[in-house]
Amino acid sequence: MKPYIFPSSIETARALILHLVKLMLDEPDRTFCIAFSGGSTPALMFDLWANEYTDITPWERLKVFWVDERCVPPENSDSNYGMMRSLLLSIVPIPYENVFRIQGEKNPKKEAARYSKLVMKEVPVENEFPVFDVVLLGAGNDGHTSSIFPGQEELLSTDHIYEANFNPNNGQKRIALTLSLIHISEPTRPISIS
């Protein structure tokens, strides 16, 4: 995969938004399934998207999923869904039925299983695995992505789509898209701002 380097985080976010919108506009006869991460980079992207690119985005053809979620209610400031809802989803005309959140307030193992089944139903399946059109990944300062932290290599080769997991630094429970699925989704777009 060719890396793209931009001079600022704002320019990175704008380029990513325009890329996603172009993908959707280039194929007007289908729905796109995108899995989003949380964190500071997506927060900037969501804010810019709502304020600068609402009118050019075919919201009715976008299905929104999450790469991971902290096990907190959506009102909690740590919720990835809550952040996206406040910065983007509550502002743009995306149909409610196109938003598929991880219910972080539920039992993590049961919710990972429920969300895995939901993704299998809503996302196109190839070779018995769902394949997102785009998976947007962030990278934490400690090396984690999709709530998979260094030392949690068992989540690199599981057959499960989503797994209950935890942050080894503070014990916070999370639900994570496993690396098995990240590898088969095309394209996966890692985002790193430094």
Please provide the spans of the model-predicted regions.
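Short, well-ordered amphipathic alpha-helices
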Residues: L20-V21, L44-Y53, R85-L88, S116-M120
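Ligand-binding beta-strand-loop-alpha-helix segment within the catalytic cores
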Residues: T57-D133
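Single conserved hydrophobic/aromatic residue that forms the stacking wall/gate
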Residues: H183, T188-I193
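Glycine-rich beta-strand-to-loop/alpha-helix junction loops that act as flexible
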Residues: F36-T41, L137-N141
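A glycine- and small-aliphatic-rich helix-loop capping segment at beta-alpha/alpha-beta transitions
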Residues: L48-P58, G82, S86, P150-D159
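N-terminal glycine-/serine-/threonine-rich phosphate-binding loop
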Residues: M1-I34, K109
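Class I SAM-dependent methyltransferase SAM-binding "motif I" and its flanking Rossmann-like core
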Residues: L137-S180
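Short gly/pro-enriched beta-turn/loop segments at secondary-structure junctions
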Residues: E128-V134, A139-N141, S185
